Amino acid sequence: MALSLYLIAVICSLVGFTASQQTCDNDNRFCFPNVVANWIGAAEYCSRNGWRLAVLDSEQKQQQVEELAQRVDAFKTAKVELWIGASDLAREGKFMWHPTGLDVSYSKWIAGMPDNKDGYEHCVHLWYEPSRLINWHWNDVVCASMRRFVCEQA
């Protein structure tokens, strides 16, 4: 049994997952798996479960995610960071939606972002930290960092 748990932990770490894995149901367009992953791991997790990393390409979709996130008990903390499906991995400074290949046109960047700090920030996350007046804004961060994420029905 201990060996099985160890092997599961090793396999999960190889694809960038930690914590318990929960699938999303079809009751909502968006969901927040109880999984922590890097950006690639988050995209893979959503895809393997028939979803995609969230494409927030309109104010309406952004508001839907904000409203749903505010109902998640785990997010009633001082700081929440969630991966979404945008990055500039293909071309620096040109943010695209990974799941669709379309350019990011709608955005809700924090003032002064994206900034590609130190040349390593290529993936986008939603950031909620009311003490810093950050209210579900976007920020570019290092893709290898671990955080929860938002999946969307594909």
Curated annotation (Swiss-Prot):
(Microbial infection) Interacts with non-structural protein 1 of dengue virus type 2. Interacts with envelope protein E of dengue virus type 2. PROSITE patterns: C_TYPE_LECTIN_2 (PS50041). The keyword Ribosomal protein does not apply. Putative lectin. May have a regulatory role in mosquito immunity. Probably suppresses replication of dengue virus type 2 in mosquito salivary glands. Residues 27-152 form the C-type lectin domain. It holds the Pfam family Lectin_C. Female salivary gland (at protein level). Not detected in female carcass without salivary glands (at protein level). Not detected in male tissues (at protein level). Gene3D superfamilies: Mannose-Binding Protein A, subunit A. It is found in: Secreted. InterPro entries: C-type_lectin-like (IPR001304), C-type_lectin-like/link_sf (IPR016186), C-type_lectin/snaclec_domain (IPR050111), CTDL_fold (IPR016187). Disruption phenotype: (Microbial infection) RNAi-mediated knockdown results in increased expression of dengue virus type 2 envelope protein E in mosquito tissues at 7, 10 and 14 days post-infection via thoracic injection of the virus. Increased titers of dengue virus type 2 in salivary glands of infected mosquitoes at 7, 10 and 14 days post-infection. Increased transmission efficiency of dengue virus type 2 by mosquitoes, measured as a proportion of mosquitoes with positive infectious saliva among the total mosquitoes tested. Residues 1-20 form the signal peptide. One of its GO terms (cellular component) is extracellular region. Keywords: Disulfide bond, Lectin, Secreted, Signal. It comes from Aedes aegypti. Disulfide bonds join 46-151, 123-143. GO terms for molecular function: carbohydrate binding. This is C-type lectin 16. The keyword Secreted applies.
